């Protein structure tokens, strides 16, 4: 079965795995892990890494060149709408008018849970200014629909807390978000290992964004390769359609044509 491409806003992609750039030991490991992941979209925390705003520091774009990858600036570290909006404006300036961004407005330092009120405020302003918004949000289906209705091009509910590795804690609500959405739904945050990524895709999600699950692994490049395979396997399983769950056994061997009677 031929799969359709992942379409986000005005762009389309073959890979459904999106990766971050934080927590690697150096730029070489970052480069190798991203290559092993097969990702086409690479997200960058504008407030934390250098993509040209500091001429005297190593530039991350030397290992993720914009001509090879779609750079997805994100607003990690922003705790109010105003700082998130300013960060997106800076990203557009540094990336020569690039308007696809990942919006995340955090509620507190301990949970890094999304502040929905400030997220909605920032999203409205940025969309009015021509940005294409991929938005980090809770797994609340009502909030997800509101963000879609205002014009966000992708909804990104958390699987569990950022960097926790706890996996997909509320698969039912994420399934509801996906069933109700007319834009891509990508799990963002909480993935810890390959099985978590596969589960997200089996739920019908359009993709998964991850960073710590790869960067904090004992062997990040190998984990990146595992995640690539998990995304592909989970997607194929979803397209294939799983067997129905049953309460009782159902023998797989035929019940007719026995040699012995």
Curated annotation (Swiss-Prot):
Pfam families in UniProt: ThiG
What GO biological process term is on the record, naming one? thiamine diphosphate biosynthetic process
Which pathway does the protein contribute to? Cofactor biosynthesis; thiamine diphosphate biosynthesis
List the GO molecular function terms. Answer: thiazole synthase activity
Q: What class of enzyme is it?
A: transferase
Q: What is its main location?
A: cytoplasm
Disulfide topology: none
- Per UniProt, 1-deoxy-D-xylulose 5-phosphate binds at 163, 189-190, 211-212
Keywords annotated in UniProt: Cytoplasm, Schiff base, Thiamine biosynthesis, Transferase
One GO cellular component assignment for this chain's record is: cytoplasm
In terms of Gene3D superfamilies, this protein maps to: Aldolase class I
Enzyme Commission number(s) of this protein: 2.8.1.10
Reactions catalysed according to its record = [ThiS sulfur-carrier protein]-C-terminal-Gly-aminoethanethioate + 2-iminoacetate + 1-deoxy-D-xylulose 5-phosphate = [ThiS sulfur-carrier protein]-C-terminal Gly-Gly + 2-[(2R,5Z)-2-carboxy-4-methylthiazol-5(2H)-ylidene]ethyl phosphate + 2 H2O + H(+)
Does the keyword Cytoplasm feature in the UniProt annotation? yes
Q: CDD domains, from UniProt? A: ThiG
Subcellular location per the Swiss-Prot or TrEMBL entry: Cytoplasm
Q: Which domain of life is it from?
A: Bacteria
The record's subunit annotation is: Homotetramer. Forms heterodimers with either ThiH or ThiS.
Role of this protein: Catalyzes the rearrangement of 1-deoxy-D-xylulose 5-phosphate (DXP) to produce the thiazole phosphate moiety of thiamine. Sulfur is provided by the thiocarboxylate moiety of the carrier protein ThiS. In vitro, sulfur can be provided by H(2)S.
Instruction: Identify its protein family.
Output: Belongs to the ThiG family.
In Swiss-Prot or TrEMBL terms, this protein is called Thiazole synthase
Organism name: Acinetobacter baylyi (strain ATCC 33305 / BD413 / ADP1)
Cite the source lineage: Bacteria, Pseudomonadati, Pseudomonadota, Gammaproteobacteria, Moraxellales
């Amino acid at each position: 079965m031929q799969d359709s491409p992942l379409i986000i806003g005005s762009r389309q992609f073959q890979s459904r795995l999106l990766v971050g750039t934080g927590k690697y030991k150096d730029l070489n490991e970052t480069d190798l892990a991203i290559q092993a992941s097969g990702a086409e979209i690479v997200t960058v925390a504008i407030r934390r890494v250098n993509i040209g705003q500091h001429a005297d520091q190593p530039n991350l774009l030397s290992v993720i060149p914009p001509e090879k990858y779609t750079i997805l600036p994100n607003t990690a570290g922003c705790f109010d709408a105003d700082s998130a909006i300013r960060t997106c404006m800076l990203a557009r300036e540094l990336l020569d008018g690039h308007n696809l961004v990942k919006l995340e407005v955090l509620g507190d330092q301990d949970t890094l849970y999304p502040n929905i009120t400030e997220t909605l405020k920032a999203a409205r302003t940025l969309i009015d200014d021509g940005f294409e918004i991929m938005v980090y949000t809770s797994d609340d289906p009502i909030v997800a629909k509101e963000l879609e209705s205002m014009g966000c091009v992708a909804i990104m509910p958390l699987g569990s807390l950022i960097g926790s590795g706890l996996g997909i804690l509320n698969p039912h609500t994420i399934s509801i978000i996906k069933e109700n959405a007319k834009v891509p739904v990508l799990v963002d945050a909480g993935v810890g290992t390959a099985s978590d990524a596969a589960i997200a895709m089996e739920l019908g999600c359009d993709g998964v964004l991850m960073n710590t699950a790869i960067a904090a692994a004992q062997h990040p490049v190998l984990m990146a390769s595992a995640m690539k395979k998990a995304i592909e396997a989970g997607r194929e399983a979803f397209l294939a359609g799983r067997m129905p769950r049953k309460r009782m056994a159902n023998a797989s061997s035929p019940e007719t044509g026995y040699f012995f009677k």
